[in-house]
Amino acid sequence: MKSEFEASPVVDAAPWIDLRRYDQSWFERGKPGWFILWWWFVQAIAFPLSLHNSHGFRCWLLRLFGAKIGKGVMIRPTARFTYPWKIAIGDYSWIGDDAILYSLDRITIGSQCVISQKCYLCTGSHDFHDVAFNLIATPIVI
């Protein structure tokens, strides 16, 4: 008896997902491509090389790229932000080491919140009921 992994594929069956039909041309990143590349460059160099307690510097960089950052916010040097112009962080909140804010849509973090190390906030997913596996982006509010 063959296991399910040894069975021959059914080549005539319609695929559940057809990635040839995937299209995200409708998706709006919110800024032009050169601006996004500039942000990725700044984040890759300035964040990890900034001093341990340079929270103000990292907040300033995020604000420079459009994030709404409250007072007293602490952001660790290894935190990552996909599109800072889609992020708002309230007063006295902390973003821990290796936290990733994957902001295809808005991410709003209130005051006095902690997004701890290695947290992954993801506003994007895919519609696995759709044969084209289209992108879904939904805001996160904490």
Predicted regions and their residues:
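Terminal amphipathic alpha-helical/low-complexity segments used for targeting or macromolecular assembly
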Residues: 1-67
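Flexible, glycine/small-residue-enriched loop-and-beta-strand segment within the central core
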Residues: 49-60, 76-89, 94-142
